[in-house]
Design a protein with these regions (language model features):
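Hydrophobic transmembrane alpha-helical segments in integral membrane proteins
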Residues: 1-13
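Juxtamembrane/transmembrane-helix boundary motifs in multi-pass membrane proteins
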Residues: 1-2, 28, 74, 195, ...
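Structured C-terminal helix/loop/strand segments within mature extracytoplasmic catalytic/sensor domains
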Residues: 10-84, 96-104, 111, 300-435
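Sec-dependent N-terminal signal peptides of Gram-positive bacterial secreted proteins and lipoproteins
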Residues: 84-92
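Active-site-adjacent loops and short helices of periplasmic peptidoglycan-processing enzymes
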Residues: 91-144, 148-258
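Bimodal feature
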Residues: 109-112, 152-155, 160-164, 198, ...
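Carbohydrate-binding/catalytic loop surfaces
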Residues: 186-193, 260-266, 367-368, 375
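Mid-domain, small-residue-enriched loop/turn segments at the edges of structured enzyme/sensor domains
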Residues: 206-329
Length: 435
C-alpha cells in the first residue's frame, strides 16, 4: 500500500467515526453501520499487508461487502441494479485472479516490440524470441555482479568470510528505494544472529543482493569488486549487447543533478533523455563516490520521483539482451565455471531451493533472479529436474501498464512451471514463438 492508499483507508475510518461526536448520532443502527464499515476497511488493509492481495482487488471485494451488508440492498429496485453489477464484477474478478499461464505467452506474442524470451533445453536454444534486443535489466543485472564476486573468490582476491560493517552498507541505503528489500534482509540477518559487532560476512552481503535484491548491497559490491572488473568480465564472456554497469542507487538522483530551478518537468525530461550513456553513467559514478566517502549522506534523503521521471529512469537502466543472460545461465547450469566460482554462484542463485523446501521434491537445481520497475518485469532462471533435464529461461518485458504488470506477476510462476514440466505446453510455446 502506498501513501495515498493509507490516506484513503484511514480517511474512510475517520469520516465514519466523526459523526459520533454528536450524541444524537449514536443510534444502534448507525453504530452497526460504522462497525461494518470499519471492519471492512480493516479487512482490506489486512488482506493487502498479510496476504499480499492486490490493493485494487481488495477494495473491489470491500465494495461488494458493503453492498451485501447494507439492508437497503435487499429492496426490489436495488436488487435489479446490483445483481447485474455483482455478476459483472464477479466475472472480472475471476478473470483477474484465475491461474492462467497462457496469459504470459499471449503477452509475448502480442508485444514483440517490448518483449524478449529465451528458452534452452539441455543445452539447445529452442526459442530466441527478440532475444538479441537490448532492454532494461533492472535488478536482473545483479546476476553479473554476483558472477564477478564468485570469480574473485575463486581467484583469492576476496574471502567469503570477510567482515563488512553495516555502516559501510548504509552509505548506499536510500529508504523506500528497493521495495523494502534491504530492511527485509537486515531483519532476517538479525533473526538468524548473523550480525556480530555491527558486521556481517561478505557472502551474506552478496546473498542480500540476490535473495532480497538489496540495492545498497549491490552498490557496495560494485565499489568493492570494481566497476572496471565487472565490465571486463562481461566483455570476456562475450555479452555483446550488455551495457557497462554503473551504480544503481545514485542513478536515482541524476534528475536532481540535471535539474535547475527554472526547469519545468518537461524540460528536465528532455535534458535527461538527451544525455549520452557515458554522460549519464558518469554522473551516477560521481554521486556514488560521494556516497561512499560520506560527502553525500543518504540518511537524511527522501526520494520523490514523478511517474514520468520514473519512466525516464527505468528506460535508462543498464540494458542487455536475453541472449546475454541466457549465456550466463548456461555457464552456471552446465558447470562451465571454475569449481569454487561455480559453488559460490550456485549458493547465491539457488535461494528458491533454500527458502522453499518443496522445490527439492521436484528439482535438483533451481536458480533465479528477477528485476522490475513500474514498467519492467524480468526474470532469468535455470532449472535441473530430477531426471537431469536442464532448462534456462530468460524474459525481459518492458513498457508494461499496471494491469499487464499485475497479470504477468500473477501468472508467471505457473507459466514457468508449466513450461518446465508440461511437454505439450512446452511444444506450444516453442511453436508459437518460433513461427
Amino acid at each position: 500500500m502506498n501513501l495515498w492508499a493509507w490516506v484513503g483507508m484511514l480517511g474512510i475510518i475517520l469520516f465514519t467515526l466523526l459523526p459520533f461526536i454528536e450524541k444524537k448520532k449514536r443510534t444502534r443502527e448507525e453504530i452497526q453501520k460504522a462497525i461494518v464499515t470499519v471492519g471492512i476497511v480493516l479487512g482490506i488493509i489486512l488482506a493487502v499487508l498479510l496476504f499480499d492481495i492486490n490493493y485494487l482487488v481488495a477494495v473491489l471485494f470491500g465494495f461488494l461487502a458493503m453492498i451485501l451488508f447494507d439492508r437497503k440492498t435487499y429492496t426490489k429496485k436495488r436488487l435489479i441494479i446490483y445483481i447485474p453489477i455483482a455478476l459483472i464484477l464477479s466475472y472480472l474478478t475471476y478473470a483477474l485472479l484465475r491461474n492462467n499461464p497462457n496469459y504470459v505467452l499471449e503477452h509475448l506474442k502480442e508485444h514483440p516490440e517490448n518483449s524478449s524470451f529465451y528458452f534452452a533445453e539441455n543445452g539447445e536454444v529452442t526459442v530466441a524470441y527478440e532475444s538479441d534486443i537490448k532492454r532494461p535489466l533492472a535488478s536482473t543485472v545483479k546476476i553479473l555482479i554476483a558472477l564477478e564476486y564468485a570469480m574473485q573468490v575463486e581467484e583469492n582476491q576476496l574471502q567469503k568470510d570477510m567482515l563488512v560493517s553495516l555502516d559501510d552498507l548504509s552509505k548506499f541505503y536510500l529508504k523506500n528505494s528497493d521495495g523494502g528489500a534491504h530492511e527485509s534482509w537486515l531483519e532476517v540477518m538479525k533473526q538468524n544472529n548473523k550480525i556480530k559487532d555491527n558486521q556481517v560476512t561478505l557472502h551474506d552481503v552478496a546473498k542480500g543482493m540476490i535473495t532480497y535484491s538489496s540495492n545498497a548491497n549491490t552498490d557496495y559490491l560494485m565499489h568493492l569488486l570494481g566497476v572496471e572488473a565487472i565490465n571486463a568480465r562481461k566483455n570476456q564472456l562475450g555479452l555483446n549487447q550488455h551495457d557497462d554497469v554503473y551504480p544503481i542507487v545514485s542513478a536515482l538522483y541524476i534528475s536532481d543533478v540535471v535539474k535547475t530551478d527554472e526547469m519545468s518537468d518537461e524540460e528536465l525530461i528532455h535534458e535527461l533523455e538527451a544525455l549520452s550513456f557515458d554522460e549519464y553513467s558518469t554522473i551516477a559514478h560521481q554521486l556514488s563516490q560521494k556516497m561512499q566517502t560520506g560527502e553525500f549522506d543518504l540518511s537524511e534523503e527522501t526520494l520523490e520521483l514523478s511517474s514520468k521521471l520514473q519512466k525516464v529512469w527505468s528506460d535508462r537502466l543498464i540494458g542487455a539482451s536475453a541472449n546475454d543472460y541466457g549465456k550466463i545461465l548456461q555457464l552456471i547450469s552446465h558447470d562451465q565455471l571454475p569449481t569454487d566460482a561455480a559453488k559460490t554462484i550456485r549458493d547465491l542463485m539457488e535461494w528458491p531451493m533454500q527458502l522453499n523446501k518443496d522445490n527439492k521434491e521436484h528439482y535438483l537445481h533451481l536458480g533465479s533472479k528477477g528485476g522490475s520497475t513500474m514498467f519492467v518485469l524480468n526474470n532469468a532462471m535455470y532449472v535441473e529436474d530430477l531426471k537431469g533435464n536442464q532448462f534456462e529461461i530468460v524474459y525481459l518485458l518492458d513498457e508494461l501498464n499496471p494491469l499487464e504488470s499485475f497479470l504477468i506477476r500473477k501468472n508467471r510462476n505457473s507459466f514457468e512451471a508449466k513450461l518446465i514440466n508440461d511437454v505439450d505446453f512446452r511444444k506450444e510455446v516453442i511453436q508459437e514463438l518460433t513461427q
